[in-house]
């Protein structure tokens, strides 16, 4: 049977790749809610595409309230839920091989937003179900593929689904790493803010912003400074660049205006984007720019003091919450990560987002409460509705985990 399955996918490989590329072309970033489209027009479109494709492949499929697409292998009761998603994080910039929604295959790799997270694996799971059906493999229970469209934002897709349907006895998600991950860290995904009265004494920071999504380490950030000479700003930025690896450019907003007349300078910071779960693989342009701005000789103000407090809580390249006082780890689930990947500072206040992946040992008391108090001390308020997401752990010796590992070993030979 294994040989038949292998031959089947050799025959259908190009067909599957074509369908993966077709779904990548849909820019399914969570958008403004529209009537009947809770996650935006493009996310509704991608669910409709997936359901239509599933039907073409001979499977039963339906879209539920434009929140999830549900695809069944047969009419039996569901024994297995396969959880995948078709929404993606914002495209960002700095793409080199291709544009984010123009998929290409180069040197044996498929490039495009969602190719690995999670459109490629979702379509692969769909073709696995088609293979079972086409090869006449008889199953006494149903496998159900549940395709969400809000995983990257708030997981309202699966929340909706499981408010309507019972969980299957077993489930897995093709949205991780091989051979298998049996632990999902808990987390804290929340907002913070601070307000103050505008102060006009020069020099001052007019604005600082960056980031496209809370769960993406930003590669771009920008700021406007008023009342300092370009020479001073460039000197600080050069020092910060040497310390952080963040690249800075400094340009006048209005050339020809002197510092004592309120000359304004535009600062751009460029880093490297990555997923927030592995922040060390990127270089956070937002925290790099905050570090530079906090080092400038600006006039004392409530806003500048708050920015310095933020720089102390989230210092550049502190991936583990050491400065915030929440660093911790355990042998099973690893180390806590903490970062701020979206910040918007203006003359009367700031707001930002926090992304933390918390190990099994983390709790409200030793993580959320500590971070809230740390922010409060700097005049920054965490969203009062903040809650920690609990971790999920299935012990390695469970039969379902062992079955999945055995399948991987048989197919991959490792």
Tell what function each PLM region has.
Residues 101-114, 263-273, 410-412:
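Glycine/charged-rich beta-loop-alpha catalytic/anionic-binding loops adjacent to active sites
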Residues 152, 158-359:
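Midchain, well-structured core segments that form catalytic/ion-binding scaffolds
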Residues 232-249, 393-414:
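Active-site-adjacent substrate-binding region
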Residues 348, 361-393:
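C-terminal structural cap/anchor segments
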Residues 50, 122-132, 161, 225, ...:
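Buried hydrophobic packing segments
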Residues 79-147, 153, 168-169:
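Active-site metal-coordination/substrate-binding segment of hydrolases
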Residues 8, 80, 343-348, 388-390, ...:
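Zn-dependent metallopeptidase/amidohydrolase metal-coordination segment
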Residues 1-83, 89-92, 351-353:
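N-terminal helical capping/dimerization or prosegment-like subdomains
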